[in-house]
Amino acid sequence: MTTSVIVAGARTPIGKLMGSLKDFSASELGAIAIKGALEKANVPASLVEYVIMGQVLTAGAGQMPARQAAVAAGIGWDVPALTINKMCLSGIDAIALADQLIRAREFDVVVAGGQESMTKAPHLLMNSRSGYKYGDVTVLDHMAYDGLHDVFTDQPMGALTEQRNDVDMFTRSEQDEYAAASHQKAAAAWKDGVFADEVIPVNIPQRTGDPLQFTEDEGIRANTTAAALAGLKPAFRGDGTITAGSASQISDGAAAVVVMNQEKAQELGLTWLAEIGAHGVVAGPDSTLQSQPANAINKALDREGISVDQLDVVEINEAFAAVALASIRELGLNPQIVNVNGGAIAVGHPLGMSGTRITLHAALQLARRGSGVGVAALCGAGGQGDALILRAG
C-alpha cells in the first residue's frame, strides 16, 4: 500500500493582530512558508505536482489565494492549486487531502499548508449592491462574522464554549493555570532553540535602510502567571470563566509541508520527518468545540489500530484552554505529552494555518525522538474535529 511522508516543512513566525506581519497578505505569507518548506526538504519547485493551502478569511484576498502563494513561491504555472476552507481545520485538512491524493496515486509530490492574515480581513457592507433607501447601515467584520461567530447559535464561539463549560465544569483557575503554562512552555522552547527547525525569518521592508528580520512569535509572554491571568475580566459572560488570557490569540502567519509518496522520497534519496497514518474526521452532535479533538483522535486511533497509551507526542490546538483540558480529560492523556512546547494560547491561532503548524511541530518532535507515534488534532467551527496519526520516519 502506498504510504505518504512529511519530508519537511516550515512556518513563519506568528504575528499579533496589527503586529509585525500586518502589511503582508495571507498569500504572501503562504509563499514564504512554501519556499521555506521546499528549501528544508531539498526539493526543487519543479517537482511539485499540486498545492493545497487552507485559508478561512478570503474576502478581499483576490482570486485563488493558494495559487497566488504557489506562483509567488516559484512553483510553475502548470501546477494546479486548491484553496480550502474548513475553518480552523483547514491547515490539517490540506495535509490529509494531500495524503489521500498520494495514496490514490494521483500525485507523488504535494505541498500542503495554511495561511491567514486576520489583520487584513476587511469589513463587509452587506446588501450594498441592491442599495439602501433609508436609515443606518451595519458594516460587518469579516474576521468576526466569517471566522469567529458560530452561525448555528448566532453567538461568538467563545460564548458557545462558555456555555459548554457549564457542563464540563472547568474552573477559572484550571483554565488560567493551563494558559499560563502554555506561555511558559513556549517561551522556554524558544529559549532552548526548539522552534529553530521550523520557523523561517520574514524580511519586513522599512522606509529606509535594510529590511527588519521578524524571527520569533510575538504573542508569547514569558512572565505570564496564573495569578496575573486571574485579574482579567471574563470575555463572554459576566459570570464566565473564559478570558482573553485563556483563549487563543488573533494572529497572522503561514505554514507549509512537503508531502511525498514514500517510494518517491526513497528514489530521490530523501529522509523524512514522519509517515502519515490514519485520519480521524468527526462532527456533532452540535456546534460546540470541546469534545471534537478527543473524538477525532479516538477515531484516528481506532483506524490505526492502536490505543491512546501508545501515543508519545500529542499536539492539540488551543482554541481555548477549555478545549485542551477537555481533550486531556476525555482521552485520559498524560498532560506531560500534550503541547509540550506551548500552543495557540501563547503563539497565536491564524485560522487557516494552525492545523499545519501543529502537524509540522508534532512531526519534528517525532523526528528528534527517532521513534514513536504522535497525533495532531483540532476542533473547528460548526462542531467538527480532525486528527492525523503520525509515525516517526
From Swiss-Prot:
**Residues in the active site?**
88 (acyl-thioester intermediate), 349 (proton acceptor), 379 (proton acceptor)
Question: What name does the UniProt record give this protein?
Answer: Probable acetyl-CoA acetyltransferase
Known EC number(s)? 2.3.1.9
Pfam families to which the protein is assigned, alphabetical: Thiolase_C, Thiolase_N
Question: What InterPro entries does UniProt report for this protein, alphabetically?
Answer: Thiolase, Thiolase-like, Thiolase_acyl_enz_int_AS, Thiolase_AS, Thiolase_C, Thiolase_CS, Thiolase_N
Catalytic class of the enzyme? transferase
What cellular component terms from Gene Ontology apply here?
Answer: extracellular region; plasma membrane
Task: Write down the species.
Answer: Mycobacterium tuberculosis (strain ATCC 25618 / H37Rv)
Q: Which PROSITE patterns match?
A: THIOLASE_1 (PS00098), THIOLASE_2 (PS00737), THIOLASE_3 (PS00099)
CDD domains in the record: thiolase (cd00751)
Q: Which residues make up the pro-peptide?
A: 2
Q: Which family does it belong to?
A: Belongs to the thiolase-like superfamily. Thiolase family.
